[in-house]
């Protein structure tokens, strides 16, 4: 029986990449999106790509970050799926290589139990181009998942993970139910449930 569900945020619970929305404000959307794609496809180290992309955001007003973070388009079926999983007695958590400004706000809307992500450093109301947090490396999600499993007393067979990119691979290694959601090929290969349609409720039919 499944007891723990862990979802990625960008392009999984949310329809898009938070950092790409920030970059569009600075007119560098295409440049940042290209780096994001390289990282999600596994062609670029996640830590390096994160530093590079956040560095390009230096000078962006934090008020703009908050406004964008609070107006993101959530994935169809996200709220309903989380609600149903919780009704089935599962703990639902969000792991994101993105940012607390977005995952913290979405927690109250989508209803998951906790979020682990990164924090954009700001000074005098503007981004400094620096970032820190729980989810900065390729191994971060797998590392945090193992810690959560230990705390909750949950094993791999009782764990569901759902993501779309290469930085989700580490958590796929520690879960019995592995959902690749509109995912890159590198992640699909490791999944035992593959969903091609942007509708998270499809998970409910398969578990």
Task: Identify what each model region corresponds to.
Residues 1-120, 198:
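Alpha-helical substrate-recognition element adjacent to the catalytic core
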Residues 69-207:
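C-terminal cap/substrate-recognition subdomain and adjoining C-terminal extension
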């Amino acid at each position: 029986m499944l007891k723990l569900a862990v979802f990625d945020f960008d392009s999984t619970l949310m329809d898009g990449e938070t950092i790409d929305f920030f970059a569009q404000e600075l007119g560098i959307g295409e440049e940042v999106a290209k780096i994001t794609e390289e990282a999600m496809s596994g062609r670029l180290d996640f830590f390096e790509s994160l530093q590079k992309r956040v560095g390009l955001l230096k000078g962006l007003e934090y008020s703009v970050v908050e406004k964008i973070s609070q107006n993101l388009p959530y994935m169809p079926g996200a709220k309903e799926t989380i609600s149903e999983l919780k009704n089935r007695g599962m703990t639902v958590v969000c792991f994101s290589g993105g940012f607390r400004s977005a995952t913290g706000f979405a927690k109250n809307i989508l209803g998951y139990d906790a979020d682990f992500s990164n924090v954009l450093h700001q000074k005098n109301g503007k981004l400094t181009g620096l970032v820190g947090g729980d989810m900065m490396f390729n191994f971060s999600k797998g590392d945090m998942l193992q810690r959560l499993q230990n705390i909750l007393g949950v094993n791999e067979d009782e764990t569901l993970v759902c993501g779309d990119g290469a930085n989700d691979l580490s958590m796929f290694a520690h879960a019995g139910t592995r959902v690749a959601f509109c995912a890159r090929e590198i992640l699909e290969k490791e999944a035992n449930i593959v969903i091609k349609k942007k509708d998270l409720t499809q998970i409910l039919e398969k578990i």
